[in-house]
Structure formats: structure tokens, C-alpha cells
Regions:
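Hydrophobic faces of well-ordered beta-strands that scaffold small-molecule active sites
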Residues: 208-210, 251-253, 297-299, 402, ...
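Loop/helix patches that line or flank the sugar-binding groove of alpha-linked glycan CAZymes
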Residues: 204, 220-228, 239, 455, ...
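Substrate-binding/active-site clefts of carbohydrate-active enzymes
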Residues: 213-249, 256-396, 417-421, 438-439
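Aromatic-rich carbohydrate-binding modules that target alpha-glucans
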Residues: 2-3, 8-64, 70-103, 133-170, ...
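Active-site-proximal helices and loops of the catalytic beta/alpha 8
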Residues: 287, 291, 305, 310-316, ...
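C-terminal beta-strand-rich structural cap/linker in extracellular carbohydrate-active enzymes
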Residues: 624-638
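Short edge beta-strand/loop segments characteristic of extracellular beta-sandwich folds
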Residues: 18-24, 124-132, 605-607
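Short, compositionally biased P/S/T/A/G/V-rich stretches that sit at domain boundaries
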Residues: 1-3, 104-120, 352
């Protein structure tokens, strides 16, 4: 069941609800709360047993939240909540029946001078007003004696969101709201506050990222198939002309540290680069060349779990309760592994990605999705916290930021404390595959934008939603993330997804989506090979998109390559695309038209995802003819 125990004021959300979740205890050794707030992942919201029930209290923004429980790895809805729905998120291939919690305060209209309701970015101040769905007919911002009409930006299950944007304002701002509601005139305010700026380094906003999985990218003996394909950091260094030549000025590397797998998400040694990838020497030489070229670098940090073969975990396996590292992991009992487990391991009967094992080959520890190779770290341990801080700080002497793997499987407060110990220039993004609000603002500057990816899939790839519905999803992300939206890492695909080109089956539609990615708010990123039309395979699990890079240029799609370079050049040379406001002009059917503008610069982006010609109107009375599955970007100035 769930219960709400009032609200607490919050400088980001205005207020948060105290929500208690509980479920009967039935002999499980552990339990976790799962939900749309942590992408239904174990690890982040561990429950406490009191008597005959598991309990946890969390602070949640108002709205509708989907949730369930993990009882020693067993997924279970709330048996005491009859409100159930099928929750589907194509972005991380989740579709299950889950429980639904509604969290809402008493007021029909709400505003607070907090970060998500009053913020400054790019020389502009944004005002946001929230109302119960259907309550407000219109709303007006009263500012300095002027009436400014507010635009209805988005709606969700409970609320309508209204917004207004004005030029930058100095010092405290005095303002109020007027309007018409279903019950007559309404008035809210006055308020007096200083608009809030998000604390984050500015350099990421001017970047276009290129993501590389080193084993699959370049090397002296790169193979087209197999587990280990032979790519390394020496090969990557030799191919920087290709990356820089297209205009990419930031690089994201998947894990490069010592591990037993090609992908590196089972780290054995956090302080040394994998010898298979060229070791520390290759990394140092790569960093020198990146700095010479002005290319920023972020690394992939795996701190939800380690490898089974990490020395700390091996010490626990050998010494059991006497190990000094027993508190490093979520150990459930002793011995940590059975004798039959060790025999199966030594005889090669336990492949690293298995979730099952021969009869009797048991293990007594929590792990990433029940994979024995990846034992879960104990995020409550102060030793683990200091270890993570030390590792991240060590590599930030050479790198410029971190992407944190399975960030939604670690408590949000853990990342808040980590960020406090990092240099202010470091760009920190988390892998949060659903609603990321609990992880943004205080913890991460941005997240891998799975919320946007979900909307992109449904509109561009699957055609499940109309342009009007697509716009609503865009604006919901915007009101929920506020200025942090500009720091989101936006993508069409990555190492955990299928290649976008494989999903859309059409080069023209792929380029339409790429044009949107490069001209929308947030930081655009391209997965290696997308620029040449590299294909993967559908239904291939996590390996679906991890095709080795093709370096024979006769195999490249020149049309995609040239358009990618042109879009990157446009992005890097446009402050409007990096910092500018977003103004929807036309979102109808399969056509979207919007303006990005700042100061004296204005670009209009028109994208036709339909199979017919479309004529659209532009500001200033001009019109534009768009062929099927095409886009145009027009410099309209001011």
C-alpha cells in the first residue's frame, strides 16, 4: 500500500510529498521499491522490515507514479492497491502491469519561486504555473505592470502546465498571476523572488558528443564478429581525424578499465586501463591528442556493481565474514557461493551473462539483474562512497566528466554527496532510463535522456503518436526538467539499444530524426558508425547495435555522412541551437515546425515525416514546400 504524509518545502520542486510504501513480509531476505522514478530497478530504494511488513518513505514530486516491489528479485505489484495499469516504455523495453500512485496537493493552482517554477537560462527568465487538469481556461503573468499571456505548454494525468518567458531580469522579481478558471476569475500572488540559475559547467552546451565502444571501433586487428573484436585506444587515437573532421568536439567512451568482458561493465581494476585496450599508456596518449584538438572526454563509471573477480569481492568469497570488504557488497549469507558454484565456475559452466546456474550452484549476494558476474555494491557503506569519490577524482585529472552507469540503481542522495566532492568543471550525467527528476539538479547536471528517446521512438520510428502528442511529451519533459533539459545527453541510439536506422528502415526518416536531435534543446550525441549508416540487427538483445565499425569507405553511406557533418557544423555555430528558446510553430499530423532563437539569431526547423508533400508557413509570411520524409532548416534572423 501507499500513504501520503504531508509535504515538505523544496528549493527545486517547490514542495515534495512524503510517501510511504509498504508490502507484507513473507520471508524474503530483502525488498526494494521499484517505479517510474528509478526505471523499475533494484538497488536505489531498499526497504526496511518492521514486524510483518516492508516499509520505505520517499519524497516525491506531485503527480502520477507507477510502482511495484522487488521481493528478493521477484517482481510484484502492490497487492493492496487496486489501481493497476500496463506501463510501457519502448525506450528500455519495459512493459508490465504495475501499481499506480497519485500524489496531489489541495490547491487547484500552484506556483512556487523554486527552480522548476522560476528559473533563468540563456538570458531569459521562465515562469511556470501548474493547475489541476481542466481547471484553468486562461492565465496571465503580471510583471512590472504588464500583462503577459501564458501559453498552455503541456498536460499530464493530473495537471495542466502554463508558461511564460521574458528577457533577463535583474535582482528580485515581483510578479503575480491572474486568469479565468472553471469556477470564475482566479488570482495568485504576489511573489517576490530572484530567478534561480542551474549550477552547471557551461562547456557541455557547446559540444556534440561521439560515443565509442572501444572494442568495436578501431584497432590493428578489428574483427567483424565474435565476442572480443580487437578494438583498442591506439586504434581510436589513429581515427580521431574521422571524428574531428565531422565536427564532433566531445567523446564519450564506454568502460575502459580492466575487466573480463569486451564491454567492460564488470570492472576488476578501477585504477588501470585494460591492457586489452592498450593500457594506461594508450589512454595517456589518447588524452594528449584529444586535448591538442580541443575535444572533451567523459568516461563511463560503473559503481552499482563490480566484477565477481574484483579483488575486494574475491576476498569476501575466500574469507567470508572475516573479510574486511564484507560491508562493501550486499551479502545475503555465508558461504557467499556454494562449492558447486565454484566447481561450475572452474569448469566453465557459468557464462558471464547468465542469470541461472546448474542445480546447487548458488550464490548469496545481490547482483545486477541477478547476473552472478556483477555483485551489487553496498551504497549505504561509507567505504564504498569514499572509494567511488577516489576513483572519479583520480580520472578527472585527465578526463572532463563522467557518465554513471545504472545510476537509477543507486540512491539519489549518494550521487548528491558524490557531486559535492567533484570539481565544478566536471560534467556529470547519469543513466536514468525513465523519469529522472529525483536524480537531477542536486545530483547530476544531466541524464541520458531516455524520456526524450521514448518520445522520439514513438513519433519518428513507430508512428504511434501524432505531432500534437509528440509536442505534449516534449513540453512535459521541459516543465519537469526545467533548465536541466539543456544539459541532457540526447541520442537516437546507444550501446544498449538497436540502431535507429534499423528501426526506421529508411534513410530519409533517419535523417529527419537526426535533424530534430541536432536542433532541439539538450546536448546531441551520435553512436559510433551512425554517421556512415552502420547497421546492427533487430532483436539481438544488448548486442543488437554493437556492430564493429566499418573502415572501408566503399561501405559508407555518403548521404548520411555528409548530412551528419552539415548538421554538426550548424549546431556548433549556432547559439540559438545551443542556448536558445524553443517555440513550436506547427505540430500537426506527421509535420513539426519550430523556432530556436536567442538574441538576434533565429532558426526555423521544419520536418515532414509523412509520405506526402507538405506546405508550411514561416514567420514573416513566407512558406516552405517539404517533400515526403524531408526537413529544412531556415535562418530567419530577426
Amino acid at each position: 500500500m501507499y500513504k501520503t504524509f504531508g509535504f515538505v518545502e523544496d528549493p527545486v520542486f517547490g514542495r515534495l510529498a512524503r510517501v510511504e510504501f509498504s508490502i507484507p513480509y513473507r520471508g524474503e531476505r530483502y525488498a526494494y521499491l521499484l517505479g517510474s522514478f528509478n526505471a523499475f530497478n533494484e538497488g536505489s530504494f531498499r526497504m526496511e522490515r518492521r514486524g510483518s511488513r516492508w516499509f520505505i518513505r520517499v519524497l516525491l514530486p506531485e503527480g502520477v507514479w507507477r510502482y511495484a516491489f522487488s521481493l528478493e528479485g521477484r517482481f510484484e505489484r502492490d497487492p493492496e492497491n487496486e489501481n493497476v495499469e500496463t506501463y510501457r516504455r519502448p525506450s528500455y523495453k519495459f512493459e508490465k502491469e504495475v501499481s499506480v500512485a497519485g500524489v496531489i496537493g489541495p490547491e487547484p493552482v500552484y506556483h512556487s519561486p523554486s527552480l522548476l517554477y522560476l528559473y533563468t537560462f540563456g538570458g531569459r527568465v521562465n515562469f511556470v504555473l501548474r493547475a489541476k487538469k481542466g481547471y484553468l481556461v486562461s492565465s496571465t503573468l503580471i510583471l512590472k505592470g504588464k500583462d503577459i499571456e501564458m501559453r498552455k505548454r503541456a498536460s499530464d494525468e493530473l495537471f495542466d502546465y502554463f508558461g511564460a518567458e521574458v528577457g533577463n531580469l535583474e535582482g528580485p522579481v515581483e510578479y503575480s498571476f491572474l486568469g479565468e478558471s472553471s469556477e470564475g476569475p482566479f488570482e495568485l500572488g504576489p511573489f517576490s523572488a530572484v530567478p534561480i540559475a542551474l549550477k552547471a559547467p557551461e562547456w557541455p552546451l557547446e559540444r556534440v558528443f561521439y560515443q565509442v565502444m572501444p572494442d568495436r571501433f578501431a584497432g590493428n586487428c578489428l574483427r567483424d564478429s565474435g565476442n572480443f573484436c580487437g578494438g583498442d585506444l591506439w586504434g581510436l587515437k589513429e581515427r580521431l581525424d574521422h571524428i574531428a573532421g565531422l565536427g564532433f568536439n566531445a567523446l564519450y567512451l564506454t568502460p575502459i578499465f580492466e575487466s573480463t568482458t569486451y564491454h567492460g561493465y564488470d570492472v576488476v581494476d578501477y585504477f588501470h586501463v585494460s591492457r586489452r585496450l592498450g593500457g594506461d599508456e594508450a589512454f595517456d596518449e589518447l588524452v594528449k591528442e584529444l586535448r591538442r584538438r580541443g575535444i572533451k572526454l567523459i568516461l563511463d563509471g560503473v559503481f552499482h556493481h563490480t566484477s565477481f573477480f574484483h579483488p575486494y569481492f574475491q576476498d569476501v568469497v575466500e574469507k567470508g565474514e572475516e573479510s574486511r570488504y564484507v560491508g562493501f557488497y550486499r551479502i545475503l549469507g555465508f558461504p557467499v557461493v556454494s562449492k558447486r558454484f565454484l566447481r561450475a565456475l572452474n569448469s566453465g559452466l557459468l557464462p558471464g551473462d547468465t542469470r541461472s546456474a546448474p542445480m546447487g550452484a548458488e550464490w548469496n549476494y545481490e547482483s545486477f539483474y541477478s547476473v552472478w558476474l556483477m555483485p551489487r555494491l553496498n551504497s549505504d557503506s561509507e567505504e564504498v562512497f569514499e572509494f567511488v569519490v577516489n576513483v572519479m577524482g583520480y580520472w578527472l585529472k585527465k578526463a572532463d566528466g563522467w557518465r554513471l552507469d545504472v545510476a537509477h540503481g543507486v540512491p539519489p542522495d549518494f550521487w548528491v554527496r558524490v557531486r559535492e566532492r567533484m570539481p565544478s568543471s566536471a560534467y556529470l550525467i547519469g543513466e536514468v532510463m525513465d523519469d529522472a527528476r529525483l536524480y537531477l539538479f542536486r545530483g547530476f547536471h544531466g541524464v541520458m535522456n531516455y524520456a526524450l528517446y521514448d518520445a522520439i521512438l514513438k513519433f519518428f520510428a513507430f508512428g504511434e503518436i501524432s505531432a500534437e502528442e509528440f509536442l505534449n511529451e516534449l513540453e512535459l519533459i521541459s516543465v519537469r526538467y526545467g533548465p536541466a533539459e539543456y544539459y541532457a545527453y540526447n541520442f537516437l541510439d546507444n550501446h544498449d539499444t538497436e540502431r535507429f536506422l534499423d528501426l526506421v528502415h529508411d534513410e530519409r526518416l533517419y535523417l529527419c530524426a537526426l535533424a530534430f536531435l541536432m536542433t532541439y534543446k539538450g546536448i546531441p550525441a551520435v553512436f559510433y558508425g551512425d554517421e556512415i549508416g552502420l547497421r546492427g540487427r533487430l532483436g539481438g538483445g544488448l548486442d543488437a547495435g554493437r556492430t564493429p565499425m566499418k573502415w572501408r569507405e566503399e561501405n559508407w553511406n555518403r548521404g548520411i555522412l555528409e548530412t551528419t557533418g552539415e548538421l554538426i557544423h550548424l549546431r556548433r555555430n549556432s547559439k540559438a541551437l545551443q542556448f536558445g528558446t524553443f517555440r513550436p510553430l506547427l505540430f500537426r499530423g506527421r509535420t513539426i515546425v519550430y523556432e530556436r532563437a536567442i538574441d538576434g539569431e533565429s532558426l526555423v526547423v521544419a520536418i515532414n515525416c509523412s509520405e506526402v508533400h507538405v506546405k508550411v508557413s514561416l514567420p514573416g509570411g513566407k512558406s516552405l514546400n517539404l517533400p515526403p520524409l524531408s526537413f529544412r532548416i531556415v535562418d530567419t534572423g530577426r
